[in-house]
Regions:
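Secretory targeting signals
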Residues: 2-13, 33, 37-94, 120-188, ...
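Membrane-interface capping segments at transmembrane-helix boundaries
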Residues: 267-275
Length: 275
């Protein structure tokens, strides 16, 4: 069964469960999406192993007086390598809507289901759920690898600790956040190459541009960007906290705001945008 046949079978006001099913079929039928996400998981599990090895070497060479500040998760969950995951997730989210624009499927969808905002809500929910599952796999796998490598020196962190729960939750939510942001950009822009460029600018260049200005408001703006608050939420020690770093509650607030605003933009823009 194709996405077109599912949408054509709807008449009048479709039930949300039908819309969820249709959007899921469209999501998994996107070319190369499954391969891209599988490759993303494999790459980050490999990077987790390399990062854990680096953390182990740092711990071995660290003077005793500095060890209390050691962050056992930083080698895996810290650093700019996570920007790749953000770009991939944002691009996948964007293509869930720009691909429909290029094929004309979006017009067929709105012909079958005129209530555009219900379609948009279903698309947001399916995209977020799928990317959360991928994020959870990466988070759990990376954490397990890190624990395995570091447990021999008794420097790992307990699974039940508040830091671990926060770290796993933030990592699991990073991909759906970026996917929804990409979906919002794709809904507004409507062109795949331009949207991918916008995703890269938003997630990579904008945070560094804000930080380079070094004024109070630009620092606050930089802290509100996904990479910044993700980095804060994945810190499990004190060694990587510097001046101007936002608090954990502020980081969670920024994350929730990004999720909410992205979904609102998708639902609003899809209601008025020409297709």
């Amino acid at each position: 069964m194709t996405a077109e046949s599912v949408m054509a079978s709807f008449a009048g006001r479709a039930r949300m469960v039908d819309l969820f099913a249709a959007e899921w079929i469209k999501f998994r039928s996107l070319r190369s999406t499954a391969a891209t996400l599988a490759a993303l998981v494999a790459v980050y599990l490999y990077l987790a192993y390399r990062g854990a090895q680096d953390s182990y070497q740092v711990w071995q060479s660290m003077p005793g007086r500095l060890r209390p500040a050691f962050d056992p998760a930083h080698g895996v969950f810290g650093g700019p390598t996570w920007m790749l995951a953000m770009i991939v997730a944002g691009s996948v989210g964007a293509m869930t809507v720009t691909g429909e624009h290029s094929t004309g499927l979006i017009r067929a969808t709105f012909t079958a289901v005129p209530t555009r905002r219900r379609v948009a809500a279903a698309k947001c929910a399916v995209t977020a759920a799928a990317m959360t599952a991928i994020g959870a796999v990466i988070a759990a796998g990376s954490f397990a690898i890190n624990e395995t490598v570091l447990s021999g020196d008794h420097v790992s962190i307990p699974v039940s600790s508040a830091d671990t729960i926060r770290l796993l939750a933030a990592t699991s939510l990073l991909l759906p956040l970026c996917a929804l942001a990409g979906l919002a950009l794709g809904t507004v822009i409507g062109n795949t190459p331009a949207t991918v460029v916008a995703v890269c600018v938003l997630f990579v260049f904008t945070p560094f541009a804000f930080k380079s200005a070094s004024t109070r408001w630009t620092v606050d703006a930089a802290n509100a960007m996904p990479f910044s608050f993700f980095s804060r939420l994945t810190v499990t020690g004190q060694g990587h906290l510097v001046g101007g770093t936002e608090s954990v509650p502020a980081a969670w607030t920024a994350l929730a705001a990004w999720l909410a605003v992205s979904a609102i933009i998708v639902i609003s823009a899809m209601g008025w945008r020409d297709v």
